[in-house]
Design a protein with these regions (language model features):
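N-terminal active-site segment of His-dependent metallophosphoesterases
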Residues: 1-67, 167
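Active-site neighborhood of phospho(di)ester-bond hydrolases with catalytic His/Asp-centered motifs
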Residues: 11-13, 52-57, 80-86, 122, ...
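Solvent-exposed loop/turn segments at secondary-structure junctions
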Residues: 15-18, 58-61, 86-90, 125-128, ...
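Short, solvent-exposed loop/turn segments at secondary-structure boundaries
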Residues: 23-25, 64-65, 198-202, 278-279
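Second-shell loop/turn segments in exported
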Residues: 27, 56-59, 158-162, 196
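Short, motif-level signal for alpha-helix interfacial/capping segments enriched in acidic residues
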Residues: 32-36, 200-216
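Short, high-confidence coil segments that cap the C-terminus of an alpha-helix
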Residues: 49, 183-184
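Extended active-site neighborhood of metal-dependent phosphoesterases/phosphodiesterases
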Residues: 63-182, 207-217, 232-267, 278
């Protein structure tokens, strides 16, 4: 096995901070996430990493919740990539269009290269009943998609899931094709799981499974949303669902991912599992 990684990066999923009482039934401790983030940053700052990515749900609700959680991120010395999850849109309707900018994102979906690897961030909130105000065409289209999934009896026909539109799918397809032409392996990241089948999965995720299999260069898809975590392999792609930081009163969860030519190493901290995933 190759001894030195191509690159290393940190992963955090679902801090879901809010100044709110715990939800004991789901074991979620919203206020504790700031201290958990600070603890995670203390560890990650001591590691040689190319960047740290947070896989959505920085907050549980309320626009003002962004201030303390983003202030905590100032303690992270590494480059940081943020993306929204469903809870990041639990804000006033007039703020919905500002969420991506509040997270410092260059666009709702985008890609970048590090260490010869192409990283792609997708936005599964695009087609959802929470990311656009009621009465807008995008909200109506999302409601129609959800109604169709409900009629089919789809297990992921939930108001707290979402999907991607045709424009974003075409962009993703073109991005993977360009990476393949350049000889780049790809890691795709999003909030919603795609595989194995689960009630938390992205609407229409089967299209992405098929696209990744056809592309042949997507080594991993990394996500949050399902706080208990999950793991699967479909074709040549690993699907890794990282555990949610907001869960449990005191136990933290985050990870360092190492990419090698022949494998992916996940070094889990706290509740997160360590894994070796052969390529």
């Amino acid at each position: 096995m190759t001894s030195s990684p191509l690159l290393r990066f940190g992963i955090i999923a679902d801090p879901q901070y809010a100044d709110a009482e715990p939800w004991a039934l789901l074991d979620r401790y919203y206020r504790n996430s700031i201290a958990k983030l600070e603890e995670a940053f203390g560890v990650l700052n001591g590691e040689d990493l190319s960047f740290v990515v947070t896989l959505g749900d920085l907050i549980d609700k309320d626009w003002q919740s962004f201030d303390p959680v983003l202030a905590a991120y100032k303690g992270l010395r590494h480059e940081s990539f943020l993306m929204p999850g469903n809870h990041d849109f639990s804000v006033a309707p007039e703020r919905l269009g500002e969420v991506h900018a509040r997270l410092g994102m260059p666009a709702a979906w985008h890609d970048f290269s590090r260490g010869g690897i192409r990283f792609v961030i997708i936005d599964g909130n695009e087609m959802s009943v929470f990311s656009a105000p009621e009465g807008t065409p995008r909200h109506a289209a999302a409601r129609a998609r959800l109604d169709a999934l409900l009629a089919e009896g789809a297990i992921n026909a939930k108001e707290w899931n979402g999907g991607i539109g045709d424009e974003q799918f075409a962009w993703l397809e073109a991005t993977l094709a360009r990476a393949k032409a350049a000889g780049e392996k790809v890691v795709v990241m999003g909030h919603y799981p795609l595989y194995p089948e689960n009630e938390h999965n992205l609407w229409g995720g089967e299209r992405l499974l098929d696209l990744f299999e056809r592309s042949g260069n997507v080594i991993a898809y990394l996500n949050g949303h399902n706080h208990v975590g999950n793991l699967g392999r479909h074709g040549s792609t690993w699907y890794v669902n990282f555990k949610g930081m907001v869960d449990t009163e005191k136990q933290n969860t985050f990870a360092v991912v190492e990419l090698y030519p022949d494998r992916i190493e996940i070094i889990g901290y706290g509740r997160e599992d360590s894994r070796t995933l052969p390529l």
